[in-house]
Amino acid sequence: MTLRCLEPSGNGGEGTRSQWGTAGSAEEPSPQAARLAKALRELGQTGWYWGSMTVNEAKEKLKEAPEGTFLIRDSSHSDYLLTISVKTSAGPTNLRIEYQDGKFRLDSIICVKSKLKQFDSVVHLIDYYVQMCKDKRTGPEAPRNGTVHLYLTKPLYTSAPSLQHLCRLTINKCTGAIWGLPLPTRLKDYLEEYKFQV
């Protein structure tokens, strides 16, 4: 991963999302830097990106939440940009998001990494796993061998999402054919900016 903090964050750890950049020329961003910037803009539109937050703050936010509730925050580990904090049956836990070669994936042990799906954006990664959990979870399962099932079902918003964004999510859940809808072009452009269901 070729990320560096552009300015000190004051907490001895990492910077906030706006402080991260890629190594290279400041005048003309590389294609990878442009992809990362686009992915972070998308993440900023979600309403469930919390920015700089400690592990303990994330645990406190998720403590009373139902199982499957999640948020995205800046990672406290300098080798990672972001972390998913999620409420499991055993309490809140954290999972790092790896960014490498212009792709995002969940961090895992080496023997499994090559099998994990990679995504162009964090929101696409989260959307994929939310849909996968929705399809696979039919009822409460008893964990085997001390394992804990991790489900991503519902984001924890920083504040109430706008009505526009909620409508966009509903439309995305109903159809993927935005340009076939009887809507003004400007509205279709708005819907096209965020094509996810979560």
Swiss-Prot record:
One Gene Ontology term from the biological process aspect of the record: cellular response to hormone stimulus
Ways its activity is controlled: Substrate-binding is prevented by the covalent inhibitor MN551 that cross-links with Cys-111. Also inhibited by a MN551 derivative, MN714, which contains a pivaloyloxymethyl that allows cell permeability.
Superkingdom of source: Eukaryota
Phosphoserine modification, residue list: S30, S52
Changes after translation: Ubiquitinated; mediated by AREL1 and leading to its subsequent proteasomal degradation. Ubiquitination is dependent on its phosphorylation at Ser-52, by PKC. Ubiquitination is stimulated by LPS. Phosphorylation at Ser-52 by PKC facilitates its ubiquitination and proteasomal degradation.
Chain residue ranges for the region called Interaction with AREL1: 1-75
Free-text comment about domains: The SOCS box domain mediates the interaction with the Elongin BC complex, an adapter module in different E3 ubiquitin ligase complexes.
UniProt-recorded name of the protein: Suppressor of cytokine signaling 2
Organism: Homo sapiens
